[in-house]
Amino acid sequence: MQSCLYECRVMHHRLVPKEHKFSYRIFVLALDLDELETCHKAFTFFSLNRWNLYSFNEADYVPTYEKIHNPSQNSSIKLTPALNSSLKERVISYLALNGIDCAGGKVTLVTVPRIFGYAFNPVSFYYCYNQT
């Protein structure tokens, strides 16, 4: 299994309008999107697409049939993959619409899971690899 858990530190420091800073520990999941079912079955307190202490809901990521802003092109596209497509398929479709071919490759998502059903995820990172 390639999916894993990372302990991290979130830090913030602003100077204006009033100085404010904080730092705290969090954990993030690095999920190989081909292993979602395996992860879900391997850990008692982790669930896929349903409530648990820790859960991962695919619908929280790369929404279908909604416009997704592409800042590099200053435009929005509407992602319309097949009904009931997996998160990995939606990521691959989004990349293909932007001229990037990752079909058959690996996609790892680094993100914060839902905790007690509550989703607070300020940023997620997708690491996408082509087939070679």
Predicted region positions:
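Mature, function-bearing regions of proteins
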Residues: 1-132
